[in-house]
């Protein structure tokens, strides 16, 4: 695999930049941590060389300064929201995250339940955690959030929320998924800290979009493809352009909410420490791209992959035509075509020749292996057997599994399905 990203440089530069931001705010920083902390496979696909657990490893370099607060929405607990990638509910994922962080030597200080309005399921989860010896805090559902800043930043708004007791300079606010209330938790804490005379700060850590590469760079387009279901749109940060005359990239939700966040900062701190959404971020990933063409090509491949994933979801009834249309547009913007992914023409050609569904897989060394549907095997099963034979150096004419065994397995599967 060609490398386009310097992971060691990233770990060093990112941790140093976060330390600088901690010092900027008098040794107390609330860091909203977006995305996946230790299984970021999207980043590893579009930035070849980026390790899926890079962000976790970066935090481990700050382990003596950091504590983690895991946030979960009471609404998500109540509806048993499930992580699509893991198939587990958000409340179960809180326990999984705690275990993983602790195993890696990171300190988890507490869990915070947000958007609470008396849900019995949230009460039960709180009791469950407390029986395990875990500190739990509650943030209440605030009427008029986020636009009624005068009420929100008052004793009747943030003031009613629990104050999360923390002991370390860096407080990492993370969650099982989006919409959990990470930013609200950070701002609520700032309100309480300033009431106590502590001039704490806030920053946001998101890997994508990368702020200091072009708007239509394939890496940023691949982020839009990954969030097609959310309809996130990358855009030029108008506040940054107006303040500094410098073009940077952010995404629509952060740009749209910035005036509200700015007003909250002014009410809490007296003035907003940031002039733009880009200013709030601490992401150094763009500075660690060492081969731009490698990252561009990897991102084009990712957009194609997302297209097929979107098509699969559409057929399964879990996706929409709008998501597929958006990814088709992103393919054009990235100057990519479906045939650019080697497995696509390989599987389509075999399907045409065999008159039945076919599949293809590209190995790390570039070899493309195919498999077709037969009386005994589906395309995927045939493909896996052919890949095993290829890797083991077995002639493809040799039957790795006898006809008799395959037929017996098929009969068993049908009989007890």
Placement of each model-derived feature along the sequence:
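Hydrophobic positions on the alpha1 helix immediately C-terminal to the Walker A/P-loop
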Residues: 185
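Short, small/polar residue-rich loop motifs at catalytic or cofactor-binding pockets
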Residues: 353-357
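A short, polar/charged loop-to-alpha-helix boundary motif
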Residues: 377-392
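Conserved small/polar residues in nucleotide/adenosyl-binding loops
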Residues: 404-413
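Short beta-strand scaffold segments in enzyme catalytic cores
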Residues: 358-362
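Conserved glycine(s) of the Walker
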Residues: 180-181
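A short acidic/small-residue loop/turn micro-motif
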Residues: 375-378, 416
């Amino acid at each position: 695999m060609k490398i386009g990203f310097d992971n060691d440089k990233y770990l060093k530069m990112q941790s140093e930049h976060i330390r600088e931001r901690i010092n900027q705010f008098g040794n107390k920083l609330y860091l909203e941590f977006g995305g996946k902390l230790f299984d970021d496979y999207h980043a590893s696909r579009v930035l070849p060389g980026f390790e899926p657990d890079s962000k976790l490893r970066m935090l481990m370099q700050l382990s003596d300064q950091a504590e983690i607060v895991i946030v979960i929405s009471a609404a998500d607990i109540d509806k048993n929201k499930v992580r699509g990638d893991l198939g587990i509910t958000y409340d179960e994922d809180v326990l999984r995250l705690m275990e993983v962080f602790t195993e890696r030597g990171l300190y988890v200080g507490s869990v915070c339940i947000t958007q609470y309005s008396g849900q019995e399921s949230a009460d039960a989860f709180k009791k469950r955690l407390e029986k395990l010896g875990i500190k739990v805090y509650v943030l209440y559902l605030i009427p008029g959030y986020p636009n009624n800043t005068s009420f929100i930043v008052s004793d009747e708004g943030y003031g009613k929320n629990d104050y999360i007791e923390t002991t370390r300079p860096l407080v990492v606010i993370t969650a099982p998924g989006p919409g959990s209330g990470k930013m609200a938790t950070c701002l609520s804490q700032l309100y309480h800290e300033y009431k106590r005379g502590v001039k704490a700060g806030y920053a946001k850590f998101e890997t994508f979009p990368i702020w200091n590469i072009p708007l239509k760079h394939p890496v940023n387009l691949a982020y839009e493809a990954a969030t097609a279901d959310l309809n996130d749109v990358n855009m030029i940060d108008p506040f940054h352009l107006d303040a500094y005359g410098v073009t940077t990239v952010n995404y629509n939700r952060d740009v749209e909410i910035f005036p509200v966040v700015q007003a909250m900062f002014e009410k809490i701190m007296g003035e907003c420490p940031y002039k733009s959404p880009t200013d709030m971020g601490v992401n150094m990933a763009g500075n660690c791209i060492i081969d731009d063409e490698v990252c561009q090509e990897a991102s084009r491949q990712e957009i194609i992959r997302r297209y097929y994933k979107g098509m699969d979801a559409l057929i399964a009834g879990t996706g929409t035509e709008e998501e597929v249309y958006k990814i088709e547009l992103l393919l054009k913007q990235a100057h990519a075509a479906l045939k650019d992914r080697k497995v696509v023409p390989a599987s389509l050609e075999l399907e045409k020749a065999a008159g039945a569904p076919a599949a293809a897989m590209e190995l790390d060394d570039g070899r493309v292996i195919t498999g077709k549907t037969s009386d005994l095997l589906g395309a995927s099963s045939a493909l896996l057997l052919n890949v095993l034979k290829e890797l083991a150096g077995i002639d493809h004419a040799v039957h790795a599994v006898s006809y008799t065994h395959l037929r017996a397995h098929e009969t068993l599967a049908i009989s007890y399905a």
